[in-house]
Amino acid sequence: MTSIDFPLLNRRTQNSVISTTPNELSNWSRLSSLWPLLYGTSCCFIEFASLIGSRFDFDRYGLVPRSSPRQADLILTAGTVTMKMAPSLVRLYEQMPEPKYVIAMGACTITGGMFSTDSYSTVRGVDKLLPVDVYLPGCPPKPEAVIDAITKLRKKISREIYADRIRSHRTNRSFTTNHKFQVGRSSHTGNYDQGFLSKPPSISEIPPETFFKYKSQSSVSSHALVN
């Protein structure tokens, strides 16, 4: 028996034994096994899909795209989130097993983007719905930026404690600017109280005597008929 056959015999014990904690071991095992959920609502998802190709090859980071939320532990909200899509997004997040992580990808996801000023159906920030771990700005972000966000998430996972993460999600939430619209009861379905908008009355709302009175005259707007 020589040292060539058994090279570990000449090594010191401190180089052969690893001392760690259960939390560190759990975090280390999750670093290279982040399985993202294939979720996209806008053009940002095209940039994320390009990572699957051989040019960027995100398989080297251990990322395996999954089509089921029950098999995924990472979701990248790529694209605009609307009021009608919000309940489905929350349901997908709730179906993901713990521990789970969220990356807000793109300006439309983070603040509403170009739709944040005059859109009545866009969520101004996905952090109103989900606890976000990493914010990735851009319109849209490049694939290199997505890889950088995943790298930062891996660093965050390596030093986190699972119990503290669950506690922070229940107490601490970060919100963006509130909506400037009056939200009705069914806000998750995109129905807003739009009573302040001017709406011309229909012909059925005009009394018959008023309608026939102005029928022979020149064209009159519906507002004039009511008044």
UniProtKB/Swiss-Prot annotation:
InterPro entries: NADH_UbQ_OxRdtase-like_20kDa, NADH_UQ_OxRdtase_20Kd_su. The keyword Cytoplasm does not apply. Its cofactor is [4Fe-4S] cluster. Gene3D superfamilies: 3.40.50.12280. Signal peptide: none annotated. Its EC number is 7.1.1.-. GO terms for biological process: aerobic respiration; electron transport coupled proton transport; photosynthesis, light reaction. Coiled coil: none annotated. It is found in: Plastid, Chloroplast thylakoid membrane. NDH shuttles electrons from NAD(P)H:plastoquinone, via FMN and iron-sulfur (Fe-S) centers, to quinones in the photosynthetic chain and possibly in a chloroplast respiratory chain. The immediate electron acceptor for the enzyme in this species is believed to be plastoquinone. Couples the redox reaction to proton translocation, and thus conserves the redox energy in a proton gradient. Belongs to the complex I 20 kDa subunit family. NCBIfam families: nuoB_fam, PRK06411.1. This is NAD(P)H-quinone oxidoreductase subunit K, chloroplastic. The gene is ndhK.
